[in-house]
Amino acid sequence: EGNGAESSMKYRIIGAVACICILLVSVLNYPVLLTGRMESRRYHQHREATPKAVCAVHAEKEFCTHLPLIVIDTGGAEIPGRGLVDEEDRHMGFTTTAEGADRITAQMRVMDSAEENNHPTDAPAVESDVVIHVRGNSSRYFEKAGYRLELVDENGDNNPQSLMGMDAHHEWALHGPYLDKSLMRNYMWYNIAGECMEYAPNVRFC
């Protein structure tokens, strides 16, 4: 009898939890039930970006792109955080500055014209100092690095900025998908996830 009572109580608890979960899902999806569809505020760059005319004239060999352009000026300093290996290809840690710091301060400019192609010499849409280092774990050892940026002001305090139409924030990631030769995996799946939930990060090709 004791085991039967315990088993019955267990199933009652499971049933109660299931009912609560169903109610939560119903409440969260109430707008969908009313309208019959979920409103998406997700910006899909590949579908919504305005086509740009080809540049008629600019300096010979000047870099020119229809994508947003981010220029990081480190003043010639190497960005720390690259993976180090020994002669037997064993991981030995990460690179640092001569002073032992694991990040440096640099200057960032973002060229993001809505009508024209972007060039390094264009007037920037956003300028800020940044604290930058190589990001990742095993990806630190890849030939193509990704970077973590913290936007700061002249006092070193957080400097949230809107970049490429995304919500303002002071922390950003430049992801270099070395193993994804299509360059589409993160862009595609972040956007698909963003259609299902608000917590998926925004993403742009640049």
Where are these regions (language model features)?
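Short, Lys/Arg-enriched N-terminal segments with co-localized hydrophobic residues
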Residues: 1-8
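Phosphate-handling architecture centered on phosphoinositide signaling
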Residues: 10-206
